[in-house]
């Protein structure tokens, strides 16, 4: 999976948000706020990733357990999937 190029990460008054651009605006006209972990995952999704590779990246960066990292990745992806921001 990877991020949809028609969604961009922006800093709006100190808050990180993912916003649709181009034709994606017709499908999703809102924005999604991300914390630092979500922004890190978003950056990783510039390239093709798997749940396992994203989980491993969180374990390494934040020194957390694999179960916690996988739960964070799953929650992040469940938030993004309905918007079309992630291409599976």
Protein language model features and the residues they cover:
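Acidic, low-complexity/disordered tracts enriched in E/D and polar residues
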Residues: 1-39, 43-46
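Long, charge-rich, low-complexity alpha-helical segments
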Residues: 30-88
